[in-house]
């Protein structure tokens, strides 16, 4: 980030404050950045979790949460390899990012499933809450994710951990996306049976 990430931090703070008007917000901050984060944030609905990370995109590095029929919540800790590992990952040191799911679950007091070594980022899937999942072949079938698994085996993992019944595979994500075609920047459910699509 240029200039000590000042503009980015201000933008993150504005987004967090806007969301906090409606929802609780949890932000990871490096220990050395906590004081400056506190200066930018005023809502008591924003909670800072002190932890080192290599990347700011918690949707990808963080836990995926599932809720059972009784309302109990649990996280899922996928394997994270910086969007492709040795094959075409974006960076080689991601040890702290791998710890993000466990850290957030511990902070919230939630238990979690350990789905490792299955590689998945949160932005590579989108669900409707009623058993349907969207993803792309470009991403989940990428040689940098789970090269030893077949498409059917990947689908079984998704069904096992997310309790989905229907998996819709789009062939590609947005052209030249550095995440190998994540679904979250091109297609998402707004309600069951209805999607928004970047065109």
Which residues make up each language-model segment?
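The feature marks the mature, well-folded catalytic cores of soluble enzymes
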Residues: 1-199
């Amino acid at each position: 980030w240029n200039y000590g990430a000042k503009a980015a931090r201000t933008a993150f703070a504005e987004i967090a404050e806007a969301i906090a008007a409606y929802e609780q917000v949890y932000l990871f901050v490096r220990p050395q950045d906590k004081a400056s984060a506190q200066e930018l944030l005023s809502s008591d609905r924003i909670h800072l979790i002190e932890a080192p990370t290599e990347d700011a995109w918690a949707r990808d590095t963080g836990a995926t949460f599932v809720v059972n029929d009784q309302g109990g919540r649990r996280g899922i800790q996928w394997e994270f390899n910086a969007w492709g590992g040795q094959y075409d990952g974006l960076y080689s040191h991601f040890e702290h990012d791998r710890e993000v799911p466990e850290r957030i679950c511990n902070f919230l007091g939630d238990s979690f499933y350990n789905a490792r070594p299955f590689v998945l980022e949160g932005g590579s899937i989108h669900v409707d809450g009623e058993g349907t999942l969207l993803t792309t072949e470009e991403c989940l079938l990428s040689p940098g994710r789970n090269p030893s698994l077949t498409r059917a085996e990947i689908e079984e993992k998704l069904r096992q951990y997310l309790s989905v019944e229907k998996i819709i595979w789009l062939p590609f994500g947005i052209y030249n996306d550095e995440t190998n075609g994540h679904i979250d920047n091109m297609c998402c459910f707004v309600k069951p049976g209805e999607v928004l699509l970047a065109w």
